[in-house]
Amino acid sequence: MGNNIKVTFNPDKIAAWWPAVGTYYTTTYPQNQSVFQPGIYQTTSLINPKNQQELDSVLINRYKQIDWNTWQGFPVDQKLPLVSRDPPPKPYINQSAQTFEIKPGPIIVPGIRDIPRGLVPPQTPTNRDQGRKPTPPTPPLRDTHPHLTMKNQTFHLQGFVDGLRDLTTTERQHNAYGDPFTTLSPAVPTVSTILSPPSTTGDPALSPEMSPSSLLGLLAGLQVVYFLWTKILTIAQNLDWWWTSLSFPGGIPECTGQNSQFQTCKHLPTSCPPTCNGFRWMYLRRFIIYLLVLLLCLIFLLVLLDWKGLIPVCPLQPTTETTVNCRQCTISAQDMYTPPYCCCLKPTAGNCTCWPIPSSWALGNYLWEWALARFSWLNLLVPLLQWLGGISLIAWFLLIWMIWFWGPALLSILPPFIPIFVLFFLIWVYI
């Protein structure tokens, strides 16, 4: 059975609500059946309604013809005085007890799913029956801190499942505010069936492409770039010092920095302030130094690519030649589609004369052949270069001796180049 309902008809206000028990007893016969006096309960009976909408439709159809100012047309066959809720000590002849029983319907809250209504605890007796003014209705309870009630989600979900079993209809019901037969019950705090994962305020929102490892790699790359930039600045300053020292064999003098417009303090020519006359020359020297360092890096890159065979250059004087059909001239000398490729000449006979490109040092061989064709005296250096290449141990000892002899003079220049040399060596080995 559902909760019982008590319907009170009063000229000032008509209300419907759910008390724990709504059974009332009347014992007297009416004297005037055409007039319904205030304060008298009209006993009637209804089949147990399924929901609030069915109860509203039954009551509205029954009492829509009533003139509430004169109470004419009210379907009453008895005029009964108000008596106590307590049943009489013994039954009477014309005793009647009527109850309204409905099942609770869903509560519709904007933005939230339909949640089964929980049972409302019985209300305490008010001062309606004592002749006082009606007590103003209590507004519905609101859950102002829903995040505090989500700790024990199992209990709320179990209550939600139990409520779904008792629900007899799935229609959405909307509370009609102002309707005297509409009851607003306190809302029971529950949790929705769709739970979003909790999120902490202030957590960084990472992009799917930006993983922690890639972020660390980016930071490490920025540190390497900053380190290399500081080393390049140091290299430029040391080379500028060396360049300036070439003009002053006895030592670099101090720059007075005196001119007609500005008066500056004494300083070195390698650190002139913007107000000094030597400032523009200092930056011109450093610009040339930066260009030379960039050229050195490009030369190293070309040497590395040429050593790997990634610069296909046809030699001037091929050592081996092959004659193939011109339609096969684009194929490599070893009948492969990978380097080294072959260079072909197309005669009129329809055949091509091809010779292969070296798999390594193709650009070096081309430049050496070009230099020998213009400068014949370079042929005298060929035995020396072959000897240095064949006797590598002697060449290393010679290099060590040169560094030992000129080391103190180059000590202020070589240290900034050491990180660059190490970087070039690693690239040479692992690429």
UniProtKB/Swiss-Prot annotation:
Give the span(s) annotated as Pre-S1: 2-148
Look up the record and give one Gene Ontology term from the biological process aspect.
caveolin-mediated endocytosis of virus by host cell
Q: Which residues lie on this side of the membrane: Virion surface?
A: 2-214, 308-379, 430-431
Any single GO CC term annotated in Swiss-Prot or TrEMBL for this entry: membrane
Q: Where in the cell is it found?
A: Virion membrane
| Residues carrying lipid (N-myristoyl glycine) | G2
- Which InterPro entries does this chain map to? HBV_HBSAG
Q: Which domain of life is it from?
A: Viruses
Location of region: Pre-S: 2-207
Query: Pfam families this protein is in?
Result: vMSA (PF00695)
Q: Which residues lie on this side of the membrane: Intravirion?
A: 2-286, 236-286, 401-406
Record remark: domains: The large envelope protein is synthesized with the pre-S region at the cytosolic side of the endoplasmic reticulum and, hence will be within the virion after budding. Therefore the pre-S region is not N-glycosylated. Later a post-translational translocation of N-terminal pre-S and TM1 domains occur in about 50% of proteins at the virion surface. These molecules change their topology by an unknown mechanism, resulting in exposure of pre-S region at virion surface.
Q: What's this protein's function?
A: The large envelope protein exists in two topological conformations, one which is termed 'external' or Le-HBsAg and the other 'internal' or Li-HBsAg. In its external conformation the protein attaches the virus to cell receptors and thereby initiating infection. This interaction determines the species specificity and liver tropism. This attachment induces virion internalization predominantly through caveolin-mediated endocytosis. The large envelope protein also assures fusion between virion membrane and endosomal membrane. The middle envelope protein plays an important role in the budding of the virion. It is involved in the induction of budding in a nucleocapsid independent way. In this process the majority of envelope proteins bud to form subviral lipoprotein particles of 22 nm of diameter that do not contain a nucleocapsid.
Official protein name in the record: Large envelope protein
